[in-house]
Design a protein with these regions (language model features):
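Charge-patterned, long linear interaction tracts outside catalytic cores
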Residues: 148-186
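A glycine-rich, hydrophobic loop/mini-helix early in the fold
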Residues: 21-78
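Conserved active-site and cofactor/substrate-binding residues in soluble primary-metabolism enzymes
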Residues: 3, 22, 45, 49-53, ...
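Charge-biased, low-complexity intrinsically disordered regions
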Residues: 42-43, 55-60, 108-111, 115-118, ...
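Short glycine-rich or small-residue beta-strand-to-loop segments that form or flank ligand, phosphate
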Residues: 11-12, 68-74, 97-100
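Long, charge-dense
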Residues: 85-144
Length: 186
């Protein structure tokens, strides 16, 4: 059972611009409806560095001992930069929550990864395995959202509103920093 007032780190990547090989990664530390901090890093578009960058970003922050949940809007950020949820949980000793409006279709993401690998001559097998492993967790539908996590359903019900709001704010910051003004939905 999670304690009341748990700190969530919401992760959002900036927009993908064809002229750039990287984008901003924003982390918002959120607790009880309050933004307590903002973290940032640069990640490769369609790269394989998102998990390591998130781990490094958290470990060097003053919030490292307080963050108990890392939330993302999907398992792939900055295009096809796939998160290794298990590695993040082990290295940071946190829970991970993937929250989406629509139920993800594993087949579509796997097909996109394979096409990307074939087109660029890149080995994407480790990313494909990360997607398959994450999807073993299944999805819970709560409050109109799909959540994927190792947390039990009662804990998910307690935090999904905070997780969504923190992701919304992280998304606004990432877009605002990149474009000079925020726009769009998560």
């Amino acid at each position: 059972m999670l304690k009341k007032g748990v700190r969530i780190l919401a992760i959002a990547s900036g927009p993908i611009q064809t002229s750039r090989k990287s984008t901003i990664l924003v982390g918002v530390v959120f607790r009880d409806g309050t933004i307590e901090g903002v973290l940032s890093e640069s990640i490769a578009v369609n790269g394989a560095d998102a998990t390591e960058k998130i781990v490094r970003m958290v470990l060097r922050s003053r919030f490292r001992e307080q963050i108990k949940i890392v939330a993302s809007n999907g398992i792939a950020i900055a295009g096809l930069n796939v998160l290794d949820l298990g590695l993040m949980e082990r290295r940071l000793r946190v829970h991970t929550v993937v929250l989406t409006r629509k139920k993800p279709h594993e087949g579509e993401l796997l097909m996109a990864l394979r096409r990307f690998g074939e087109a660029g001559g890149k080995n994407v097998e480790s990313r494909i395995e990360e997607v398959k492993t994450a999807n073993l967790r299944g999805f819970s539908r709560i409050g109109g959202f799909y959540l994927q996590s190792g947390l039990d359903k009662n804990d998910l019900k307690a935090i999904y509103g905070q997780a969504f709001e923190s992701l919304r704010i992280a998304h606004l910051i990432a877009k605002g920093v990149s474009y000079g003004e925020s726009k769009g939905r998560i």
